[in-house]
Amino acid sequence: MAKRVTGPEIEKLIQLLAKVPGLGPRSARRAALHLVKKKEQLLGPLAEAMGEAHRKVKICSCCGNVDTIDPCTVCTDERRDQAVIIVVEDVADLWALERAGAMNAAYHVLGGTLSPLDGIGPEDLNIRGLIDRVAKGGVRELIIAVNATVEGQTTAHYITDQLEGMEVRITRLAHGVPVGGELDYLDEGTLAAALRARTVI
């Protein structure tokens, strides 16, 4: 068994940091050491910001985004086209699409995808909220922007079935060759999807 080199407070910090996605035990140890060394400049302000986030952050009751206000900043932005809703699996997907800056639409966060094998059904996701938003009227288009996985496709089909008969155009993100991608490095499924989604130039 390895000898302890720090007190329980620093060990607890390391253990908690190791739970953050992208940080393993080794990276967490380095991050903790850096924070402790920069106690005044980093650790204090970080602890304060985390406490503030813990107290104020909530889930938007309209779209499922995380923010300090409800409805969130995205939902209350009057410059957005509220008649177009981009449906995403997770808040991280919403943020990624916003960074791309390609559309100025509203969003709806599902909170995952349907996965019967994992026991995740429609009632475990924010699908009912989406159906209610469309049923209220005023939604012209739904862009389903879920991952190109079996679960993502299942979720997209389920949503489409639930909205059958409603006056809304339902589209999906195109799948295929990434910008800067070389065909030789792509898998067969991606190439097949790219061929099916080909466009006129």
UniProtKB/Swiss-Prot annotation:
Domain Toprim: 83-178
Keyword Ribosomal protein belongs to the record: no
Organism this protein belongs to: Rhizobium meliloti (strain 1021)
Zinc finger (C4-type) residue numbers: 60-75
Its biological purpose: May play a role in DNA repair. It seems to be involved in an RecBC-independent recombinational process of DNA repair. It may act with RecF and RecO.
SUPFAM superfamilies: Recombination protein RecR
Taxonomic placement: Bacteria, Pseudomonadati, Pseudomonadota, Alphaproteobacteria, Hyphomicrobiales
Name by which UniProt lists this protein: Recombination protein RecR
Record's keyword terms, sorted: DNA damage, DNA recombination, DNA repair, Metal-binding, Zinc, Zinc-finger
Pfam families: RecR_C (PF21175), RecR_HhH (PF21176), Toprim_4 (PF13662)
